[in-house]
C-alpha cells in the first residue's frame, strides 16, 4: 500500500504551538537525514492515525508533499499519547 500525505512547513516552535496544533487535529513532525536541512512540518492527525493501523506504514517508503515538492521518507520514531488513541509527534527520515 502506498502512503502519500500533504504537509505544511511549521514555523511556530515550542510546547504551546505544538499543543495548539494537536487541539486543531494536526500533528507536529520533523523530516531529517540526507544532505538537506531538517524541516519541521504539520500533518493531519486523522490521516496518519488511520494509516498507522497498517503494518506496512512502518516499513514502506512514504511520500510527503511539502510545499509542492515530494519527499520520500520512512518512519523513524513515533510518540503516542499514554492512554488516548492519539499520536503526539512523528520523526521521518529521508529515504
UniProtKB/Swiss-Prot annotation:
- Provide the protein name: Large ribosomal subunit protein bL25
SUPFAM superfamilies xrefs: Ribosomal protein L25-like
Give the matching CDD domains: Ribosomal_L25_TL5_CTC
Q: What is the annotated quaternary arrangement, including any partners?
A: Part of the 50S ribosomal subunit; part of the 5S rRNA/L5/L18/L25 subcomplex. Contacts the 5S rRNA. Binds to the 5S rRNA independently of L5 and L18.
Q: Which organism is it from?
A: Haemophilus influenzae (strain ATCC 51907 / DSM 11121 / KW20 / Rd)
Please give the family membership noted in the entry: Belongs to the bacterial ribosomal protein bL25 family.
Domain of life assignment: Bacteria
Which GO terms fall under molecular function for this chain's record?
5S rRNA binding; structural constituent of ribosome
Read off the InterPro entries from this record. Rbsml_bL25/Gln-tRNA_synth_N, Ribosomal_bL25/Gln-tRNA_synth, Ribosomal_bL25_short, Ribosomal_L25_dom, Ribosomal_uL5_bac-type
Amino acid at each position: 500500500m502506498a502512503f502519500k500525505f500533504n504537509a505544511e512547513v511549521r514555523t511556530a516552535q515550542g510546547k504551546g504551538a505544538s499543543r495548539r496544533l494537536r487541539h486543531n487535529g494536526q500533528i507536529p513532525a520533523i523530516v531529517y537525514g540526507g544532505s538537506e536541512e531538517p524541516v519541521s512540518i504539520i500533518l493531519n492527525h486523522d490521516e496518519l492515525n488511520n494509516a498507522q493501523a497498517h503494518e506496512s506504514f512502518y516499513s514502506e517508503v512514504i511520500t510527503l508533499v511539502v510545499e509542492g515538492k515530494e519527499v520520500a521518507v520512512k518512519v523513524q520514531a513515533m510518540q503516542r499519547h499514554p492512554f488516548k488513541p492519539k499520536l503526539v509527534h512523528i520523526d521521518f527520515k529521508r529515504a
